[in-house]
Structures are given as C-alpha cells and as structure tokens.
Amino acid sequence: MVLDELISEFDRGLRSLTGISRMSRPVPAPAEAPAAELTPAERTHAAGLMRVNHVGEVCAQALYQAQKLTARSSAAKAMFEEAAREEEDHLAWTAHRLKELDSRPSVLNPLWYAGALAIGVAAGTLGDKVSLGFMAETERQVESHLDGHLSDLPAGDTASRAIVEQMRADEAKHGKAATDAGGIELPLPARMLMRAASKIMTRTAYYL
C-alpha cells in the first residue's frame, strides 16, 4: 500500500514537472471578451505573472504530496489529496495560458519542486496540526499574492484574470478547510520566513 502511494505521488511529480497535468475542470472562461488585443508589452507582462502562478502550483503539488505522505491521520491525508487535485487544475490552467501567451514555464521548476518537497516533509514531520497550519498560512499568502496579480494584470487580459479569480477562490477554500481541521497558527518568524522565500521565488520566476 505504501509502495503504491509512493508510485502514485512519483507519477504526479513527473507530470507536474513535464507539463502533463490532468485537468478535472475546464479552464475558467472570461465573462466577456477583451475589447482589444494585448500589446506585446502587455503579453510579456501577463506571461511573467502567469509563469509565477505556474511555479506556485508546481510548489503546491510538491508541498501537498510531501504533507500527504507524512500525515498521521487519514483525514489529513484526504485533505491534502483533495487540495492537490484542485491545485493540479491550477497547474494545467496556468500552463495552458502560458502557451496562449506564446511563453513557457520557469526553467527552474525542478529546483522549486525539490525545495517545496523538502519543506513539505519538514512540515509534515512536525505533526498534523502544524502541517495543516502550514497549509492554511500558505494558502493565505497565495490568496494575497493572487489579489496583487488581479490588480497588476493588463486590463484587457480577461483570460488570465478568469483563471486567477478561480484560483483565488480555491485557495481561500483550502485555507479555511485546513484551519477548520485543526491547523494551528504558525509563529511570526515562520510566517515572515515564508513571505521572504515567496518574494525570492516570485521575482525570479517572473523572468526565468
């Protein structure tokens, strides 16, 4: 049973890194078509933002895989699995949008994935309450980050905006579920360290 689980998670990891993500929900569609085509500068900027979001989803897969494998209770395992499935939709959506923008994922995705996997294992070994608290804080920070992207995306990029809005709704749901399941609030130094690491990742992934 453990071997089957490891093989399944290894397969998910490979799909995350190779761009063969499974989509259980269709790509969110904008409510209205853009008034005009994006300029080259707007496309480049939108692609940078969506590349950052794609990296975030690569990291989410690694985090939740590690936390699921190290979780003590079946309830916590199920929660991490459900979140990972929805985050895989996000991974596929952002990859799809990057292709539409004639861009690509981050060349550093293997590095981001490995780092997130190690962090997820570390959080998981501290127990389910800490691990769920880490999940809740991660989702809060991601939700805030997506709010910033909604303000920063070109006004005419309704396609990216529709994706980010659905991602934000899902992240809020995951964070609340983790808190409701008993996740504890992380100490301030841990939260600050997470924010600092996130800034490094987002600034790098925008370009690379």
From Swiss-Prot:
Binds 2 iron ions per subunit. One of its GO terms (cellular component) is plasma membrane. Its EC number is 1.14.99.60. Fe cation 1 binds at E57, E87, H90, E171. It is found in: Cell membrane. The keyword Membrane applies. Keywords: Cell membrane, Iron, Membrane, Metal-binding, Monooxygenase, Oxidoreductase, Ubiquinone biosynthesis. It is an enzyme of class 1 (oxidoreductase). Belongs to the COQ7 family. This is 3-demethoxyubiquinol 3-hydroxylase. The lineage of its organism: Bacteria, Pseudomonadati, Pseudomonadota, Betaproteobacteria, Burkholderiales. The gene is coq7.
